[in-house]
From Swiss-Prot:
Keywords: Cytoplasm, Ribosome biogenesis. Coiled coil: none annotated. The gene is rbfA. It comes from Paracidovorax citrulli (strain AAC00-1). It is found in: Cytoplasm. GO terms for cellular component: cytosol. SUPFAM superfamilies: Ribosome-binding factor A, RbfA. This is Ribosome-binding factor A. The keyword Cell cycle does not apply.
Length: 125
């Protein structure tokens, strides 16, 4: 027997996008001093909507302390999502620090170093 197809294609992406928008507002309302300037980069929701990985970056502050604070506030944030979202199951939130910006910065530095080295070699030849 064929697997049942979802009635709405890309519903998971739409739910993840709505969770990201609502969480952004809810996090702004938190009073925890460990949570500074947080930017939500992405939300990945499991197909059964039981869990959501929330990837964030921090402009100022300690990423580990922010991650701990967000994971401690996950129940409060989930409750806030429950009041805003109109879905049967609101996922359990798992906050993870997104190192993409750090990796991009490292790659840019490596590229700049390689270009500088190449131009130095060309000048010597």
């Amino acid at each position: 027997m064929a697997a049942k197809k979802s009635s709405t294609p890309n519903r998971g992406f739409k739910v993840a996008d709505q969770i990201q928008r609502d969480l952004t507002e809810l996090i702004r309302e938190l009073k925890d001093p460990r949570i500074g300037m947080v930017t939500l980069q992405a939300v990945e929701v499991t197909p059964d909507y039981a869990h959501a990985k929330v990837f964030f970056s921090v402009l100022v502050g300690d990423a580990d302390a922010t991650q701990d604070a967000l994971n401690q506030a996950a129940g409060f944030l989930r409750n806030g999502l429950f009041k805003r979202l109109h879905i049967h199951t609101v996922p359990t939130l798992h906050f993870m620090f997104d190192r993409t910006t750090e990796r991009a910065s490292d790659m840019n530095a490596l590229i700049a170093r390689a270009v500088a080295s190449r131009s130095k070699d060309d000048d010597e030849a």
